[in-house]
């Protein structure tokens, strides 16, 4: 199976510096959900700093951690981890020829996205964001998880403030 990301690709996309060579089969921003081979992106949140969980993510099998603070272990140092995640999402979209479908609205986004995914997955390689990952963190995270050979990408976009859909649609 071809890796989702290599250290060289992520270095290029994020303009970061990797401490070692690695391959990643997934991307995560939550150390509690790390799967072996994931790339962990240490985001700064309103209540937690992902950098506090880098050691935990690596001990659970993360291939590397994207950080903007120096940490021990397999890391890729960038200027801003949120911008790095956005860059990964944009790069994932550029490297595929997938038809991208965005689902927005007040009610029924997740169900509609899942129904479209179900129908299209019968025809070709289809990727959709998991659950309701539809905000400024979830959309670039979901895009960064999209395999290069995807034919259809279905993404839910939500908003908490005016103009948010516009910025998410630019991803």
Question: What are these language model-derived features?
Answer:
Residues 1-87, 91:
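N-terminal leader/targeting and accessory segments in enzymes
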Residues 8, 84-171:
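Phosphate-binding loop of NTP-binding sites
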């Amino acid at each position: 199976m071809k890796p989702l990301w290599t250290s060289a690709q992520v270095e290029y996309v994020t303009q970061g510096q990797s401490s070692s060579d690695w391959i990643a089969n997934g991307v995560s921003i939550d150390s509690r959900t790390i799967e072996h081979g994931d790339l962990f992106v240490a985001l700064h949140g309103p209540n937690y700093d992902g950098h506090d969980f880098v050691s935990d993510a690596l001990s659970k099998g993360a291939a590397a951690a994207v950080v903007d603070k120096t940490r021990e272990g397999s890391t890729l140092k960038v200027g801003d981890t949120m911008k790095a995640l956005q860059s990964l999402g944009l790069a994932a979209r550029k490297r595929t020829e997938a038809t991208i479908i965005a689902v927005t609205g007040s009610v029924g986004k997740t169900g509609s996205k899942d129904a479209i995914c179900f129908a299209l997955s019968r025809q070709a390689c289809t990727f959709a964001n998991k659950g309701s990952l539809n905000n400024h963190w979830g959309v670039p995270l979901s895009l960064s998880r999209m395999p290069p050979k995807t034919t259809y990408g279905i993404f839910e976009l939500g908003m908490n403030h005016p103009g948010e859909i516009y910025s998410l649609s630019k991803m």
